[in-house]
Amino acid sequence: PLGAPLAQVDAFVAGRARWIEAARVRALARGEEEQRPCSVSREDALALFTQVSDAVFPLFAQVLNGQRPVLKVRQMKTRWGVCVPAKRQITFSLRLAEKPRAAVEYVVLHEYAHFVRADHSPAFWAVVARYMPDYKARRRLLAPSVQGGMESPEGPPPTY
């Protein structure tokens, strides 16, 4: 608090030194991640997202009246994907292409599920779980420390 004795402030900081250092390390890692150039081109990323989308689309074709959404790729700092149902459009983060394929499959299916439910309600998560029961494990693959990389254009078959 303003006007607190310096000894009290020092004791407060000393008592939380481990947490402060851990937070500092996390903040530095985020900064390094944002400044590191992406190892995947936009074209290769779009090809990957299109390939996974082609496998997911049949699950949602009826909701979309058989019309595939427009897929886009852009540099995003805080999201892996964004779905705009009114525009029938999904935008993916370029950095998502650096993650393991199972994580990419999760994000693609997650964004498609927004065509059914445009929120993150229990009903939305039920849609995700219906088609991908292991979605929580896949979502953990999006952590900053997990790197995957691109696989061959054919890649393994979808795991859902």
Question: PLM features: residue spans?
Answer:
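Walker B catalytic acidic pair
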Residues: 111
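Active-site-proximal or metal-binding-adjacent scaffold patches in catalytic folds
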Residues: 1-106, 115-160
